[in-house]
């Protein structure tokens, strides 16, 4: 006997497919700094290699010059420790590491903003603060100074040492000239103050004696003697010539005797200079019309000093 099973012919509604709902990603937060829109960037810490090049310390700053020690690269001394910044000194020049020019090898630099893909969210002006952690740009080497520059030119080490050594009276004549040249270089070119030479008391005495000996004038025949004398006392020939010109009137006529006047013995009154430098009047009394030291006048009845007259 066959069983007839009733089949449910009712149309069934299709079961909804289980679909994963699409999640909307939230937009990246936009923060404002100083009123300017900025994006959040993922900071990639680049391991940049930092090297320290030539030393830029000015060893002549105290005298207004510019002198470098010539050290080409920083070499850490064996006693330097990274934990103690004060111990980071160069083994070659002895200067601290901060005096050396810092150079960064930035091989993985960020491309410029113009090469980045454009986005609708980057339409606003972008402020990138991640450049703050980068080291400052390296210092440029000192530029050559123009001739019209107001700052003094660099002074070489030999000139600088001679200028700082003081007034050495026993130094040779050539060294004294170098020291004088260094003093001229250390002065400001724009200043109008004239360089004046200062003499010691010993130099003044020797120059006075030498000027008396040659007659306070440098002659052609005295060239060798003047040159030897200048080398002995350490004074230039032109300086000695100017000193003799300025002091000949004050030293030449400040001696013991006054001006010598020839004595007049013919009866005419005249001036005479005695031994102690006091001017006096002298006459032998045999002439007339002159001034006499005695109370009586001459044969012609001339007046006398005491205002009394007599006739012979």
Swiss-Prot record:
It comes from Arabidopsis thaliana (Mouse-ear cress). The keyword Phosphoprotein applies. InterPro entries: Homeodomain-like_sf (IPR009057), Homeodomain_ZF_HD (IPR006455), ZF_HD_homeobox_Cys/His_dimer (IPR006456). GO terms for cellular component: nucleus. One of its GO terms (biological process) is glucosinolate metabolic process. Coiled coil: none annotated. It comes from the Eukaryota. Its main location: nucleus. Residues 192-255 bind DNA. Residues 136-155 have a biased composition (Pro residues). GO terms for molecular function: DNA binding; protein homodimerization activity; transcription cis-regulatory region binding; zinc ion binding. The keyword Zinc-finger applies. Disulfide bonds: none annotated. SUPFAM superfamilies: Homeodomain-like. A zinc finger (ZF-HD dimerization-type) spans 52-103. Putative transcription factor. It is found in: Nucleus. Mostly expressed in flowers, stems and inflorescence and, to a lower extent, in leaves and stems. Keywords: DNA-binding, Homeobox, Metal-binding, Nucleus, Phosphoprotein, Transcription, Transcription regulation, Zinc, Zinc-finger. The homeodomain differs form the typical one by having namely 4 instead of 3 extra amino acids inserted in the loop between helix 1 and helix 2. This is Zinc-finger homeodomain protein 9. Residues 1-27, 128-155, 253-312 are annotated as: Disordered. The gene is ZHD9. The record marks 244 as: Required for DNA-binding. Homo- and heterodimer with other ZFHD proteins. Interacts with MIF3; this interaction prevents nuclear localization and DNA-binding to inhibit transcription regulation activity. Binds to ZHD1, ZHD2 and ZHD11. The modification Phosphoserine is found at residues 13, 273.
